[in-house]
């Protein structure tokens, strides 16, 4: 498993647990988290944890996340995924993530592109 797939696996743990420590472990101290590329990012680990928890999916809300790391260029990885939600029958979200990692494999920049089908 490469460093980007390992990061996504840790993201999935945090997504399911909503544990502040799991979330914080994903991001550098001064990370940027873009919930959409055109929105202002959440700035810094503490803000990311707070905003994540304010908007969290409850454990069990999403049923499955299938993904593939489709590109790598140094510290930048591109992840394509599909989220299937358990709460809405047939609710699927297509995801494209830009993940830039530091030397400790924490995200310094995370950008979500998504669309519901």
How would you name each of these model-derived features?
Residues 21-73:
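A solvent-exposed, acidic/Ser-Thr-rich amphipathic alpha-helical stretch
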Residues 3, 50-117:
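A beta-strand edge to alpha-helix "cap/lid" segment located at domain peripheries
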Residues 11, 23-24, 31, 44, ...:
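Hydrophobic pocket/interface hotspot
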């Amino acid at each position: 498993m490469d460093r980007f797939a390992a990061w996504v696996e840790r993201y999935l743990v945090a997504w399911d647990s909503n544990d502040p420590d799991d979330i914080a472990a994903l991001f550098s101290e001064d990370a940027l988290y873009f919930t959409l590329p055109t929105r202002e990012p959440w700035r810094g680990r503490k803000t990311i944890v707070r905003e994540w928890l304010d908007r969290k999916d409850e454990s069990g809300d999403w049923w499955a996340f299938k993904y593939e790391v489709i590109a790598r260029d140094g510290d930048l990885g591109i992840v394509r995924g599909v989220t299937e939600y358990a709460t809405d029958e047939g609710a699927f979200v297509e995801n494209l993530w830009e993940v830039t990692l530091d030397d400790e494999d924490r995200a310094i920049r995370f950008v979500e592109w998504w669309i519901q089908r």
